[in-house]
Amino acid sequence: MAALLAAAAVRARILQVSSKVKSSPTWYSASSFSSSVPTVKLFIGGKFVESKSDKWIDIHNPATNEVIGRVPQATKAEMDAAIASCKRAFPAWADTSVLSRQQVLLRYQQLIKENLKEIAKLITLEQGKTLADAEGDVFRGLQVVEHACSVTSLMMGETMPSITKDMDLYSYRLPLGVCAGIAPFNFPAMIPLWMFPMAMVCGNTFLMKPSERVPGATMLLAKLLQDSGAPDGTLNIIHGQHEAVNFICDHPDIKAISFVGSNKAGEYIFERGSRHGKRVQANMGAKNHGVVMPDANKENTLNQLVGAAFGAAGQRCMALSTAVLVGEAKKWLPELVEHAKNLRVNAGDQPGADLGPLITPQAKERVCNLIDSGTKEGASILLDGRKIKVKGYENGNFVGPTIISNVKPNMTCYKEEIFGPVLVVLETETLDEAIQIVNNNPYGNGTAIFTTNGATARKYAHLVDVGQVGVNVPIPVPLPMFSFTGSRSSFRGDTNFYGKQGIQFYTQLKTITSQWKEEDATLSSPAVVMPTMGR
C-alpha cells in the first residue's frame, strides 16, 4: 500500500509542471563572501541548497580570468544527504509507469529547446567556447534526451513460450538503483545530458557532479528537469573535486558510475569504482587522426581539417588533432596553413568568433609547453598561436591556431593529447603506412579518412583499430540511436554511452522461468535431479 501511495504521489507531481524557467536563477545566491561574487548552490531533495562548506572554488571567465562565481566543495554531510535523497526517491520512481517517466522527458526536451540560448550563454561565460559552439553543445545533448524518450521500445525484454510443456521463459530490464555521473569542463551541457536522462528514464535516481569549473549549465538543466515534473530526489547535484570523486567511487549505495574526462582521472575512477563493486563506464583521452588521401576533395578537406582541429579551441575529446598526409597530399600544407590563419580568435560571446580561449591559465601553459617540445624534438612550426593577443581580452587564456609539421610518432607533441588548438602533421607515402601509424597509437576514440575512392574508404574503415570512423566526416560522433563507441585507451568499461548500450548500462536483466501445468496438479514426489527442461 505504501508503495502504491508513493507511486501515486509521483504521478501527481509529474502533472504539476511549469512551461518556463524563472528569469532569475535559483541555483545562484548572493555571496556569503565580502565581495559581490555569487555562489553556486547544491541541489538536494528537489531544493537548491546553500552549502555550509568552508572550502570554495573560484569560477573564472576564461576570456578575462575574472572571478564570476564560487562553487562549494560539498561537505560529507551534504554528500550523504544527496545520496539519501536519491535512495528515498528510488522505490517510487522505479515503480512509476515507464510511460510517465517518458512523459517527463518529453516535457524536458521541450523546455531545453525553449531555453537553449540561455544555457548556451552560461556555457560561453564559464567555459569560453563561442555561442554558436555552445548552442551545438546543448543541441547534441538534447538529441540524447529525445532518444531517451524511446525508452518504451529500448527497454523491452525477451520472451520464449513453451520451452517445454506448460513452461515459459521471459526476461525484462530493471533499474539498478542510485547511479552517479562525473562530468568534464569541455561539454557542460552535452555530457551531463548523456548521463542522467538515460539513467532516470530507466527508473534509476541520479547523483550528478558537474565540473567545478562550469557548474552553471548543469544547474539550469536541473531546474528545467524539475519544471518538467521530475519528482524531488530523483536528481541530486553535488560539487567538489577529489573528495567528491572518492565519495562517489566508495559509497555502497551507488550502483553505477558514468565518467568523461582525462585518462588519469578515468583510470583512477574505473579502478576505484570497480574495486567497490560498481559498474563503471569511462570515456577518456584521444589522439584522433585525419588521414588525407591525394584524391580527396581538396577545398572541402582543408576546411574540414581546420574546423575539426581548432573548433572549441581543440578542447574536444573528438578533436581532429592529427593529420596524416598521404603521398601528394603533403603538397597541401601551405594551403592548410592559410585556411587556419583565417580563423578569428576572440571571446566566445563576440560576433564572428571562430574559437575562444582555453579553460585556465594552466591549460594554456601546458599547451604552449607541448608546442615548445615539438621544436626541441625537431618538428617545424608552420603556424604559431602562442603569442596571440586579443584586443580587450589581454588577460584571457588564448592560444591561436597552431600547425606543427615534420612530426614523428616518437615526439611528445604526438604522443600526448594536447587538448588545445594545435594540429600536428605527419606524412606517409601509402595508406598502409597511415593505418599502421593510427593503429600503433594507443588511443581509439575517433578517426577520419578523406577520399573520393570507395574502396580506399572501405579498406581504411575495416583495418583501422579505432572505435569511431568517419569517411569524409571529420568528427564522427554517432547520433544517439547508436552508441558512442570509443575503444582501447580511450575507454574503460564494457558498455558505452547512450543508444542501446546506454540502456544496457543503466539496467539489469531479470529472467523468470514460469510453469503453470495444464492439469493444475501437484507433484506426486520431489524432483531431486537437475531439471533438463527440453526433454
Curated annotation (Swiss-Prot):
Q: Which residues carry this modification: N6-succinyllysine?
A: 47, 52, 55, 76, 117, 129, 364, 376, 391, 517
Q: Where is the transit peptide?
A: 1-33
Q: Catalysed reaction(s)?
A: 3-oxopropanoate + NAD(+) + CoA + H2O = hydrogencarbonate + acetyl-CoA + NADH + H(+); 2-methyl-3-oxopropanoate + NAD(+) + CoA + H2O = propanoyl-CoA + hydrogencarbonate + NADH + H(+); (R)-2-methyl-3-oxopropanoate + NAD(+) + CoA + H2O = propanoyl-CoA + hydrogencarbonate + NADH + H(+); (S)-2-methyl-3-oxopropanoate + NAD(+) + CoA + H2O = propanoyl-CoA + hydrogencarbonate + NADH + H(+)
Q: What is its EC number?
A: 1.2.1.27
UniProt keyword Transmembrane, yes or no: no
A Gene Ontology biological process in which this protein takes part is: valine catabolic process
What is its quaternary makeup?
Homotetramer.
This chain belongs to which protein, by name?
Methylmalonate-semialdehyde/malonate-semialdehyde dehydrogenase [acylating], mitochondrial
The gene is ALDH6A1
